[in-house]
């Protein structure tokens, strides 16, 4: 599906931009030009994870796709679990390899953490996708049997409980106590609703002008809101940058719909590039932190140029390096099947 390939390619580029820009956002002061430039890249790319959820929904909830409970539990979930624990263990061992200093006690403790589901931070996406896959038979049955009005109501209900209320709660603006304090959904459960939105937007996409408008609105919320909150606090205040908060979700919806409009019109060479990027996106997501951690170990930072230039430059090096590694790994059948 061309739309999904292009969207996944855009999403993985943005994942790397987020991770490269996170360092300056955490270490530098909000009242500096460098921080504001870093926030630009951190905001403009913030839709990456919800865009991946939208892509998953567009593919996995498609009525024409046969997806049985047996396939989910004998192929999809074992694939995710194998990849998750392999890469989590690899991230534990990697720092010792970089420094060529093998501390058995430290490695043992790290591997125990892996068994206890304490993994490299960015692997949280796989934790969520395990639940998304487990719920697929229910999500598919629920969506495919509802009439259009009830589906629209369900999406609105999810948007309020899974997007708006959690954002208000994180900002300290949801003052309800008792049971109402439990109304906001966690990001993990909200991701299921996001996949449903992806399915709905593939069937009935936003118009081009509307897509552009919601992208700009989402960016304004991320950049303007985060800048204002951070300047007030004196350090990064990231509530409006969270994956399924309103800003990133608005941008993701707009970008997903624009990809549907643009993808069929791309020249063949770019279509092939988008297809390659889409296929490699999962592997790049899993492995790109190796390159970024190597940057940190060897002292490669964004300080060689203004962040407006250095962040995309480092992201490009990381992407190309990781893509090359994933391409080589994909030639090994067992790795291609289970680990990327």
Predicted regions and their residues:
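Functionally critical transmembrane alpha-helices in membrane proteins and complexes, commonly lining
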Residues: 2-62, 81-88
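Aromatic-anchored segments of alpha-helical transmembrane domains
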Residues: 16-20, 88-89, 157-170, 216-230, ...
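Transmembrane alpha-helical segments and their boundary/interface "anchor" motifs
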Residues: 35, 42-51, 63-97, 104-121, ...
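Interfacial loop-to-helix transition and helix-capping segments at the boundaries
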Residues: 39-49, 114-128, 167-193, 226-254
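Structural signal for the C-terminal ends of transmembrane alpha-helices
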Residues: 58-67, 137-146, 197-206, 257-267, ...
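Solvent-exposed interhelical
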Residues: 133-160, 199-217
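Alpha-helical transmembrane segments and terminal signal-anchor/GPI-anchor hydrophobic tails
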Residues: 207-271, 275
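C-terminal "closing" transmembrane helix and its immediate cytosolic amphipathic cap
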Residues: 263-275, 289-340
């Amino acid at each position: 599906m061309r739309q999904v390939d292009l969207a996944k390619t855009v999403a993985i580029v943005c994942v790397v931009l987020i991770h490269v820009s996170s360092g300056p956002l955490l270490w530098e002061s909000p009242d500096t030009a460098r921080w504001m430039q870093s926030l630009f890249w951190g905001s403009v790319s913030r839709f990456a994870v919800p865009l991946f959820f939208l892509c998953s929904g567009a593919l996995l909830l498609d009525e024409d796709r046969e997806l049985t409970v047996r396939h989910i539990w004998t192929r999809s979930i074992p694939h995710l679990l194998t990849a998750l624990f392999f890469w989590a263990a690899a991230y534990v061992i990697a720092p010792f390899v970089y420094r060529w200093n093998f501390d058995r006690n430290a490695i043992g403790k790290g591997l125990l953490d892996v068994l206890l589901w304490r993994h490299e931070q960015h692997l949280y996406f796989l934790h969520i996708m395990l639940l998304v896959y487990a719920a697929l038979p229910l999500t598919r049955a629920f969506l495919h049997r509802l009439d259009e009005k009830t589906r629209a109501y369900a999406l609105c209900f999810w948007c309020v409980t899974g997007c708006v209320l959690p954002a208000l709660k994180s900002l300290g603006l949801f003052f309800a106590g008792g049971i109402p304090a439990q109304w906001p959904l966690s990001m993990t459960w909200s991701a299921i609703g996001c996949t449903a939105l992806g399915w709905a937007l593939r069937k009935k996409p936003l118009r081009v002008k509307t897509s552009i408008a919601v992208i700009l609105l989402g960016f304004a919320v991320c950049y303007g809101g985060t800048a204002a909150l951070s300047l007030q606090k004196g350090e990064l205040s990231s509530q409006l940058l969270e994956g399924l908060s309103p800003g990133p979700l608005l941008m993701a919806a707009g970008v997903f719909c624009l990809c549907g409009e643009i993808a069929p019109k791309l020249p063949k060479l770019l279509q092939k590039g988008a297809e390659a990027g889409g296929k490699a996106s999962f592997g790049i997501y899993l492995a790109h932190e190796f390159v970024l951690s190597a940057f940190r170990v060897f002292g490669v930072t964004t300080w060689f140029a203004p962040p407006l230039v250095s962040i995309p430059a480092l992201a490009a090096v990381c992407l190309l390096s990781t893509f090359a590694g994933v391409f080589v790994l994909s030639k090994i059948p067992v790795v291609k099947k289970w680990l990327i």
